[in-house]
Amino acid sequence: APAGERMPKAAFEVAAKGAVLVDAESGEVLFEQDAHKELPLASVTKVMTMLLVMEAVDSGKITLDDSVTISERAASMGGSQIWLKENEQMTVSDMLKAVCVVSANDCAVALAETVAGSEEAFVERMNQRAAELGMADTHFCNATGLPAEGHVTSAYDIALMSRELISRYPEVLTYSSVWMEDITHVTRKGSSKFTLTNTNKLLRSYEGCMGLKTGSTSIAKYCLSAVAKRNGITLIASVMAAPDPKTRFRDAAALLNYGFSKCILYTDDVPEKLKPL
């Protein structure tokens, strides 16, 4: 069939400039709208950052319990952050949680430096990993998603890296599904609590949502990679450049609803009474 006819035309459109819905298990694309349009992705970048950190844990290079000393550069990142101070120490696990839940730029850079020695070296690895995953619409310039010329991806590529992250490291979903949690800052002045509140409002409003990653800047508008699971089916909805936060979450919910209404999970379970004696 001609390229444009392969997929049945969905009965709706989303307001986002790029969107895709993927079955997490098979990788099948269930819906797409401008799925390969190259756009800035803001903090959804951190899906790749988290993937590389989890791979470093997996390979034994670092552990989740390792304590990391925060560099001056990581502490100075600006944007969404948990206000880490230079020379403060925090575990890889707590920093991953802060990246996932509140999109902490300071933690993202500290983790990048821990894994690769510098954010620049880490970014090289991000681009290498993107190429390995077939993310042809993607180029990373930093580990945070802070605005940078030429830092782009597509809705399709977001789904690719999200699928790789959650299929290989499903434990990340225990971080991304945290709605609210305290983490402790320990500095020379003593310890203090910092409350993380998740940036993904679908966690509260969409049944089965397990979070993953939001992103927004004035340039990128409102982006999201959302994972939801119902009846044994896991879907990934990727939305880019929605005009406002409400539309971003509404578009993602519409995609997920469409997917769950289309998906029937076939299992090999034979009803008890049909089994041979």
Report each predicted region and the residues it spans.
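Active-site-adjacent loops and short helices of periplasmic peptidoglycan-processing enzymes
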Residues: 2-156, 162-167
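Domain-terminus/edge residues, biased toward the C-terminal soluble/receptor-binding domains
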Residues: 135-139, 147-277
